[in-house]
């Protein structure tokens, strides 16, 4: 389990006891202020990123990879945050700012083997695929689209249409999705 220094102190630990547990191998330092309570714990970077930036949502190529919609391993973690959020200053993160009116639409906590990540559901990712079509390499766009076609029975089209109503260009997106799927 990943826990912060603040979380450890809330559990009654002191800075001294934290250092002692690190020395004894009972805690493992992941990054400044973040620890693993199981020294042998193996977790994905997505899980750590979700824990470190709880208000950010894993989206885009990172989310497509998590869902197995593409075999392309993203170079960066693609995170969505609300407009006017503080910038995430990490070399391995690409941050996109989204309008608060649709930022939370379709957010779920997805269980992975390594832990839980905050991402979008399939319906919202399908919208993101078409909404940001020009930002993805053509080969990856068509690979993800092909994957969506294979799992179209898992997509809740009623929910998809409800989501599309929140976007200003929802009708044109709906038409494009309907033609493609």
Provide a role label for each language-model segment.
Residues 3-6, 13, 17, 22, ...:
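Nucleic-acid-binding surface
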Residues 25-31:
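A short, conserved structural fragment
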């Amino acid at each position: 389990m990943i826990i912060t220094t603040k979380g450890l102190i809330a559990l009654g630990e002191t800075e001294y006891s934290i250092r002692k547990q690190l020395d004894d191998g009972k805690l493992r330092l992941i990054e400044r202020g973040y620890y693993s309570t199981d020294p042998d714990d193996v977790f994905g970077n997505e899980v750590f990123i979700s824990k470190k930036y709880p208000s950010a949502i894993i989206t885009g190529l990172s989310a497509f990879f998590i869902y197995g919609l593409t075999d392309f391993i993203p170079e960066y973690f693609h995170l969505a945050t609300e407009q006017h959020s503080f910038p995430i200053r990490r070399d391995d993160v690409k941050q996109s700012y989204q309008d608060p009116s649709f930022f939370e639409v379709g957010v779920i906590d997805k269980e992975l083997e390594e832990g839980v990540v905050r991402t979008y559901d399939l319906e919202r990712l399908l919208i993101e695929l078409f909404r940001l079509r020009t930002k993805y390499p053509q080969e990856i766009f068509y690979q993800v689209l092909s994957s969506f076609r294979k799992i179209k029975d898992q997509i809740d089209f009623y929910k998809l249409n409800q989501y599309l109503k929140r976007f200003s260009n929802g009708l044109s997106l709906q038409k494009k999705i309907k033609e493609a799927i």
